[in-house]
Amino acid sequence: MAGVLVEAKRHNNMSHIKSKDTTPEIIFRKALWHCGIRYRKNYKKLPGTPDIAITKRKIAIFVDGDFWHARNHQDKPGEQIKTNRGYWVPKLSRNVERDKEVNDALLAEGWLVLRFWESDIKKDVMKCVREIEKYL
């Protein structure tokens, strides 16, 4: 019975995870706006729907979740997973692979692609903003 409750709780938790307008994205966008950097959010006209697009400069920005994009495990996504590895390892591997495909597609269209980890944004959002300012 306990296993069922744990699985039900996990399912409930996972169903509430958002793919856009996450807390790190909102923090980052507010910092950009405060610095006078204007952008489009969740720009559907581009491959991969960048979280932030600075269309005037052709800069596509992604805010990558540490878990979902396998931070520190890019070579072996899912290495940190202890349960249900049969699901998570292919899932995280595909996420990393898709990130590379999106980067290549955007580069082919002449866009600069910048990716920021959620933990870097939480640690020092202004450092991330300064990185973008280098290209403006």
Label for each model-derived stretch:
Residues 1-136:
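Nucleic-acid endo/exonuclease domains
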